[in-house]
Design a protein with these regions (language model features):
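Core RecA-like ATPase module of SF1/SF2 helicases and allied nucleic-acid translocases
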Residues: 1-182
Length: 182
């Protein structure tokens, strides 16, 4: 992703307006403005505008995980690739764009999400996004693309896992697949 961004003229690790991004989790309660398309795992779009902010974690959270006092959040809007609609007010984990790692573990995300549901607190919850210039076939699962470039990975797959990987990758293409083998 960073190599492709560099080729496109992006000079920083940080997200920029025009970046292609992908959601890494389902957020069924967040829908686009016109078509009411939900934000799901694998939703791809273009970052249209944003600002960076920092949120304080609530007391109950910091008591349980004292090493995390606050989280950098990118608040922005995304133009959907599939239908030119917009998702607005997305609260994205800034660190995940920079390092590829979420600031919060799944257990911490669950804790903070449940806390917000109980209290009705409108605090920002960091959602998982990353760049979408090159994605794994697992991230593309459920989506379809005109052209797919698939590398036959040299992982220690069992035979059936290797076949599932190839099947998942190949079936993402609607027009053309290029398979790069060893």
């Amino acid at each position: 992703n960073q190599q492709r961004r560099k080729m496109l003229g992006f000079e920083t690790l940080a997200p920029c307006v025009g970046d292609k991004i992908i959601s890494l989790r389902n957020h069924w309660d967040i829908c686009s403005e016109n078509t009411h398309t939900p934000l799901t795992n694998g939703t791809i779009g273009t970052l249209t505008d944003f600002y960076l902010t920092n949120i304080q974690m609530p007391f109950g959270f910091t008591r349980k995980w004292p090493d995390i006092k606050n989280v950098d959040i990118l608040v922005g809007n995304m133009k959907l690739e599939e239908n030119d609609d917009y998702l607005t007010g997305l609260t994205m984990d800034y660190n995940e764009f920079i390092t590829g790692q979420s600031t919060l573990t799944p257990a911490q995300m669950y804790n903070i999400t449940q806390s917000h549901k109980r209290t009705g607190d409108p605090e920002m919850i960091p959602m998982s996004f990353t760049y979408a210039y090159a994605i794994t076939c697992w991230k593309a699962q459920g989506s379809e693309y005109g052209k797919v470039l698939l590398f036959e990975e040299n992982f220690p797959f069992k035979k059936d896992e290797h076949q599932k990987y190839l099947y998942t990758g190949i079936t993402r293409a609607s027009d053309k697949v290029v398979l790069i083998t060893k």
